[in-house]
């Protein structure tokens, strides 16, 4: 039976090999988990704002939001 555990070497594989050199290594502590949580919360707020604008539940003074003009085309 042939040993196929090494796989085939390709030009693309050789190019991408350095990107996988950190495989299995874990940074000590929480790392950037807190930063990721902050950005997730900001993204959630952004989505809520967009949803409220779309549903016209947020009144924007001086900015008309007429969605019917988009359906003419």
UniProtKB/Swiss-Prot annotation:
Coiled-coil parts of chain: none
Organism domain of life: Eukaryota
Keywords of the record: Chloroplast, Membrane, Phosphoprotein, Photosynthesis, Photosystem II, Plastid, Thylakoid, Transmembrane, Transmembrane helix
Subcellular location, record wording: Plastid, Chloroplast thylakoid membrane
Modified residues (Phosphothreonine): 4
GO cellular component, one term: photosystem II
InterPro entries: PSII_PsbH, PSII_PsbH_sf
GO molecular function ontology, one term from the record: phosphate ion binding
Gene Ontology BP term (one): photosynthesis
NCBIfam families given in the database record: PRK02624.1 (NF002728)
Stated role: One of the components of the core complex of photosystem II (PSII), required for its stability and/or assembly. PSII is a light-driven water:plastoquinone oxidoreductase that uses light energy to abstract electrons from H(2)O, generating O(2) and a proton gradient subsequently used for ATP formation. It consists of a core antenna complex that captures photons, and an electron transfer chain that converts photonic excitation into a charge separation.
Subunit (UniProt): PSII is composed of 1 copy each of membrane proteins PsbA, PsbB, PsbC, PsbD, PsbE, PsbF, PsbH, PsbI, PsbJ, PsbK, PsbL, PsbM, PsbT, PsbX, PsbY, PsbZ, Psb30/Ycf12, at least 3 peripheral proteins of the oxygen-evolving complex and a large number of cofactors. It forms dimeric complexes.
The protein's name: Photosystem II reaction center protein H
């Amino acid at each position: 039976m042939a040993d196929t555990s090494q796989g085939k070497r390709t030009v693309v594989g050789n190019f991408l090999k350095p990107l996988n050199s950190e495989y299995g290594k874990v940074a000590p502590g929480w790392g950037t988990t807190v930063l990721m949580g902050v950005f997730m919360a900001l993204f959630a707020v952004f989505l809520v704002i967009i949803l409220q604008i779309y549903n016209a539940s947020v009144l924007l003074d001086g900015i008309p939001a007429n969605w019917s003009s988009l359906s003419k085309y």
